[in-house]
Structure formats: structure tokens, C-alpha cells
């Protein structure tokens, strides 16, 4: 149980497993780059990784909350906004009404302004041609991918418990 204060307001935070605390104040420095978490946790269980055990399973934020946060950042003059998640490509699969990462990017692209959207990390197992098409058509999404290329060896990828192989990477790029 923790209490945070900001500008005279008090926020109480209780750790409730599997929930996302929305509307918490975010302290950002400068007005150039901002980072926006779109999801928390991970479902991949790579052999060497502790994230699913300490952060839990994937939990996506509501699209409306993300769009509102990015709209506010653009209004405040931020020029580069990076969307964050252990595996952004699986965004929205856990929501009551499942959504798609490409759909989120398309919604964010509708926000007027002079800004660039980036995202990381983009796991190849959930990358789709719909995502690439959305990126290609977008006015604001950077035409680059942050792919965690940790090995080009199928044997090593299997040992890492990665559900894809070198051929899948080559298909994507």
C-alpha cells in the first residue's frame, strides 16, 4: 500500500494482482520525447526471463485511455511518443472486447499534430501483415521496427523457448 502526492492531490495505490492503475500522475522531463505504456506483463515465458513471474501475465490498457494520453501529449508539444510493452504486437488480446495493435496504431494516427509514433518491443510471433500495412499507410508511425533479434540460430531460439525460428524473422523482414 503506497500513497503518492502531486500538486496537493493524494493518490492511494493498492497492489491488486492483474489490474492496471489508470490516471496516475506521470512525471516527464522535457517536451520532446514521451513513453506511454500500452500494456504490462508478458505471456511468452522465455527460458531466461523473469518478467512473466514478476510482472504477471499480459494486461492491456484500454484503447480510449491510451488515445487520450497520446492526444494530451501531442497537445503539450511532444514530438516523439514511444509505445511500450514487452510484446506490443499482442496488445488487446486480453481485453473484454479483443482489439489489435494495428487498430490502436490506426486510432493514434488520427490525432492531428506534428509528432512521430514509435513502439517497442515487437515480437515476431505476433507480428502481422496488417500491422505492416497500417505502418505503411500511417502519417505518424515511424517506418522502423524494434525486433529483439537475439539469435539467428534455430537451436538457440528453441533453447530460449522462443516460438519462432530464423525463417519467421526472414519472412517478416
Predicted regions and their residues:
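Conserved SAM/AdoMet-binding glycine-rich loop
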Residues: 75-173
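Proteins enriched for Cys/Gly/acidic motifs involved in redox and nucleic-acid/cofactor modification
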Residues: 1-91, 145, 167-173
Amino acid at each position: 500500500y503506497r500513497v503518492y502526492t502531486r500538486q496537493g492531490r493524494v493518490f492511494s495505490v493498492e497492489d491488486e494482482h492483474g489490474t492496471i492503475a489508470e490516471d496516475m500522475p506521470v512525471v516527464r522531463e522535457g517536451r520532446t520525447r514521451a513513453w506511454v505504456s500500452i500494456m504490462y506483463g508478458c505471456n511468452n515465458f522465455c527460458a531466461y526471463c523473469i518478467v512473466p513471474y514478476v510482472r504477471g501475465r499480459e494486461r492491456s490498457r484500454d484503447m480510449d485511455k491510451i488515445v487520450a494520453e497520446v492526444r494530451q501529449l501531442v497537445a503539450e508539444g511532444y514530438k516523439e511518443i514511444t509505445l511500450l510493452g514487452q510484446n506490443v504486437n499482442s496488445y488487446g488480446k486480453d481485453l473484454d472486447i479483443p482489439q489489435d495493435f494495428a487498430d490502436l496504431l490506426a486510432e493514434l494516427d488520427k490525432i492531428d499534430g506534428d509528432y512521430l509514433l514509435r513502439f517497442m518491443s515487437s515480437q515476431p510471433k505476433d507480428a502481422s501483415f496488417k500491422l505492416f500495412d497500417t505502418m505503411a499507410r500511417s502519417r505518424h508511425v515511424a517506418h522502423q521496427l524494434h525486433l529483439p533479434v537475439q539469435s539467428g540460430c534455430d537451436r538457440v531460439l528453441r533453447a530460449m523457448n522462443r516460438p519462432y525460428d530464423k525463417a519467421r524473422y526472414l519472412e517478416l523482414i
